[in-house]
Curated annotation (Swiss-Prot):
Function: Non-toxic to mice.
Annotated source species: Phoneutria nigriventer
Domain notes: The presence of a 'disulfide through disulfide knot' structurally defines this protein as a knottin.
Name of the protein in question: U23-ctenitoxin-Pn1a
Keyword set includes Secreted: yes
Tissue: Expressed by the venom gland.
One GO CC term, this protein: extracellular region
Length: 33
C-alpha cells in the first residue's frame, strides 16, 4: 500500500524506498537513508 515520503511521520506507516525512519524530537519522520 502506501509509503511515507521524506518528512512524513513514520510511526504508523513505513518509509518509501531509500528513506529511513528517524526520531526528531517527539516525532519519527522519514529522512534520506
Amino acid at each position: 500500500g502506501f509509503c511515507a515520503q521524506k518528512g512524513i511521520k513514520c510511526h504508523d506507516i513505513h518509509c518509501c524506498t531509500n528513506l529511513k525512519c528517524v526520531r526528531e524530537g517527539s516525532n519519527r519522520v522519514c529522512r534520506k537513508a
